[in-house]
Amino acid sequence: MADHTEVMQGINKLPGISYPVLTPNLKGFQAAVAAGAKEVSIFGAASELFTKKNINCSIEESLERFDEVMTAAKAASIPVRGYVSCVLGCPYEGKISAAKVAEVSKKMYSMGCYEISLGDTIGIGTPGSMKEMLTAVMKEVPVGALAVHCHDTYGQALANILVALQMGVSVVDASVAGLGGCPYAQGASGNVATEDLVYMLNGLGIHTGVDLQKLMDTGTYICNALNRRTNSKVSQASCRL
């Protein structure tokens, strides 16, 4: 995150689009606001070991740090989104209990996060575990304040997202060309490809307002810039890369 000020200042910001910045603590929040951020995100986890590896503290300590960020954000009228990582499994602890996910989600929502994004960080979840986890979390957080964030490491992302949609979740995180990963979860692939998600939503008759052709063109652009191959099955099938 050392160059986020440069990145923020270099973005050609368009109306109607949010450019949230990940802020692990008050210092990060202050730097983000100074760089022009109008929305921030705090990122916790349902795994003690992952939290220690990721932000070098316990879950309880991370929540205390987030409380400082929330207080400052409220004072500045800046909306905050909350992320909970490892909701369906952890690279260090293995299976994570749905009750723990619900507990952390409830605490972050109660702090004032307008939305809680539930992340399958290592992409190990299945439709069954997604349903079990969401059932537990929805008892503590309104479904209208939930989002899912599915990595596609095991090829389960779209199936898991479909379950979430059927359970009432209407916000889904995705990544153009499926780029990304996690430095603290070796072997984890990127988030579900936005192209594949939009293709599926189109097939379900769900209007997204996203132009699939332009989306694929964007994927082609960034993959060429990074010298990477797209992870989007839709783009691969369209022979774009």
Regions found by a protein language model. Name each.
Residues 1-241:
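Catalytic cores and adjacent flexible loops of soluble metabolic enzymes
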